[in-house]
A protein has these predicted regions:
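Inter-helical loop and helix-membrane interface segments of multi-pass membrane transporters/permeases
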Residues: 3-4, 32-36, 66-91, 104-165, ...
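Select transmembrane alpha-helical segments in multipass membrane proteins
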Residues: 5-16, 41-44, 83-97, 147-152, ...
Length: 451
């Protein structure tokens, strides 16, 4: 069966950016920026995005476009006879399943909060205990979380079952355009609040005193880690979209566009969070506490807060769901490519697997709340394995596969990367890609354990 292509370049860019843009852009990037010197951190982040993120992204896309296959078969198509690079393809699929085992339930939380703001569960004037109580009640109710999980899983795999152009590309285009419009509207509203200037200063103005306290080395390694992790590279989440590309555009140019969209959302998210928090005297933090406790506390005390809260969680639903359907597509393509299944059958099987695989994460907040390994609950443990092990190790494998004679080889990668119109990768960068970039990835890997 002939492989589908994206209907348009815009579709490819929005689907790929949707995969990269996710919860971390909102609940991690702004906080890490503020804590690490503001504007100076952003400059380091952008530098490492160019030095690390874009090159590895081109490698995933190159393997996909050259092979026209999903992760496992892409290695088998391009590797030398009797080599074992395709083992990493299987690890990529394990990583995608593991990522969705905790990411899908969290996407359900976003949808739940959108519903609760829209229907008036959050009322003007609620105190902080009442706001926290809504989140605590959700965490204590496996039934409620399972309902939202089921909605995300069913709708996500239904979109994938429709095919590339009629399903994921069509839906992602609508969601991403709406997401970009929503984030701009929300940022403008936040920047018009009373003490917005203080929040913007904390967020973006370089604070050399804070850099001195934190340590320049810590700022640099934090920027390096954020630039690496923001794209989710190493488990073939982007490789699959390379396999649907045509040869019209260079991969380096397309990678720059994807990273630009991802960075835009991450930076503008901070323009929502910090002005709002400083205007209402709330300490900005990170993670679930920021999204589900701190910001709802702001919204319930804001004029028109129900509307702004509804729009914010609609934005967060789109941000998380765009990643969900992108990775779901990888899982569906894995079964269709590797085992010759139809899209419908692959979507149904994956939907059943994913629903039950997500239950441990949900139960980890209530009936299995005593479970921990090395002090980590179910969600944190799954996140640690994906983020600190599978992503950096996987990125290193893609790097070695594309730059060494034992893998696909630099010349093949270079030719694929530069095929088409657009920005070209310079051959001068070969020594950097072969000898320096691996060292940077090792630093990220080590930093993940130290941090």
């Amino acid at each position: 069966m002939q492989r589908e292509n994206f209907k348009s370049r815009t579709g490819f860019l929005l689907v790929s950016a949707g995969c990269a843009i996710g919860i971390g852009n909102v609940w991690r990037f702004p906080y890490v920026t503020g804590e690490n010197g503001g504007g100076l951190f952003v400059l380091f982040y952008l530098a490492f995005l160019v030095l690390m993120g874009i090159p590895v992204l081109t490698m995933e896309l190159a393997v996909g476009r050259a092979s026209r296959k999903s992760a496992v078969l892409s290695y088998k198509t391009l590797e030398k006879p009797k080599s074992k690079w395709h083992i990493h393809g299987w690890l990529c699929m394990i990583g995608c399943y593991l990522l969705m085992m905790f990411y899908t339930p969290v996407s359900g939380w976003m949808l739940d909060y959108f519903y609760k703001f829209a229907t008036g569960t959050f009322k003007s004037g609620m105190n902080s205990e009442q706001v926290s109580g809504v989140f605590n009640d959700l965490m204590a109710s496996p039934v409620e979380m399972i309902i939202w999980l089921a909605i995300i899983v069913v709708f996500g795999f239904f979109v994938c079952s429709r095919g590339l152009q009629k399903g994921i590309e069509k839906v992602s285009k609508v969601m991403m355009v709406a997401l970009l419009a929503l984030i701009v509207i929300l940022a403008i509203n936040s920047m018009m609040l009373s003490n917005a200037g203080e929040g913007l200063s904390f967020y973006l103005v370089p604070d050399f005193g804070k850099v001195k306290n934190v340590g320049l080395g810590k700022v640099i390694t934090s920027a390096m880690s954020q630039a690496f992790f923001t794209l989710g590279l190493g488990i073939a989440s982007m490789e699959i979209f390379g396999s649907y590309m045509n040869k019209d555009r260079t991969l380096y140019g397309e990678a720059v566009q994807i990273c630009a969209l991802d960075t835009f959302v991450a930076i503008v998210a901070g323009l929502i969070i910090f002005p709002a928090c400083f205007s209402f005297g709330v300490q900005p933090n990170q993670g679930p506490a920021l999204i589900f406790v701190t910001l709802p506390n702001v919204f319930v005390n804001m004029t028109g807060g129900r509307i702004w809260g509804t729009l914010f969680f609609l934005f967060m639903t789109f941000a998380s769901f765009s990643t969900v359907i992108a990775v779901f597509e990888n899982l569906v393509a894995f079964l269709t490519d590797t085992f010759g299944m139809s899209r419908t059958k692959a979507s149904i099987i994956n939907g059943i697997i994913m629903f039950f695989a997500c239950l441990p994460c949900i139960f980890g907040f209530n009936i299995w709340s005593d479970f921990n390994i090395l002090g980590k609950g179910v969600l944190d443990l799954e996140d640690f394995v994906v983020s600190n092990l599978l992503l950096p190790i996987g990125a290193m494998v893609y790097l070695l596969f594309c730059t060494t004679k034992f893998g696909w080889g630099f010349d093949n990668y270079f030719e694929e990367c530069n095929t088409g119109k657009g920005l070209k990768l310079s051959r001068v960068l070969k020594p950097y890609l072969k000898y320096v970039l691996p060292v940077l990835i090792v630093i990220v890997f080590v930093q993940g354990f130290i941090g």
